[in-house]
């Protein structure tokens, strides 16, 4: 009896100890032989070398190795997982003809040489002259009478109104100023007979000099006295020609006197009534 009790107690103690401290089962000789044979004969390099990653089945080599064990290699295609892959591949096909079309355009846009050989001598090529319409010339001449120099905003506004470029307006004003200076030096400043509507692009319509106004002052003064202008139009007329109209009145001369003093002079002592 004592031997049976001791055997039962020893078996129970061994069973309780095994539950408290679980340990891995000891590897047998066959297990060691299994892992040693596979681990010794196959290296990681040999494993990856035997895989068919060099075959053109998929564009992504890591798709052929299923790490989760759900399927064999090559089960996922790049189009299902990356739908934009085809679009990027097709972009190269669209890009090649576009570049081929742009090549002749860049050749045509090259500027022509400014100097050409004519009879063995270099000759500079000039751009064609700009032909202004009568409306454009009239507007430019009216603006030149007001101011011979334009600021950048004024030049841009005038060019937009006339349908010209700012460079064309600037060159026109430069030519007009040079022509005016040349005529002024020669004493050939034209009068008001050159109206702004004149189509001659080289005519200078600057404000007239006081000497031109001296000849026309009596007729103009008599006309204003006989037929007075309306009240609304006379101030604007005098404001436009204020520096040119009032300046000759300060000069002395019988032709600058008012019509009343010029035609009704006081009689002398020996005058006959």
Swiss-Prot record:
GO terms for cellular component: nucleus. Residues 20-30, 198-235 have a biased composition (Polar residues). PROSITE patterns: HOMEOBOX_1, HOMEOBOX_2. It comes from the Eukaryota. Residues 125-184 bind DNA. Residues 15-37, 188-235, 248-273 are annotated as: Disordered. Belongs to the distal-less homeobox family. Expressed in regeneration blastemas. Detected in forelimbs, hindlimbs, the tail, flank, and brain as well as in limb and tail blastemas. Residues 258-273 have a biased composition (Low complexity). Pfam families: DLL_N, Homeodomain. Keywords: Developmental protein, DNA-binding, Homeobox, Nucleus. It comes from Notophthalmus viridescens. InterPro entries: Distal-less_Homeobox_TF, Distal-less_N, HD, HD_metazoa, Homeobox_CS, Homeodomain-like_sf, HTH_motif. One of its GO terms (molecular function) is DNA-binding transcription factor activity, RNA polymerase II-specific. It is found in: Nucleus. The gene is DLX3. This is Homeobox protein DLX-3.
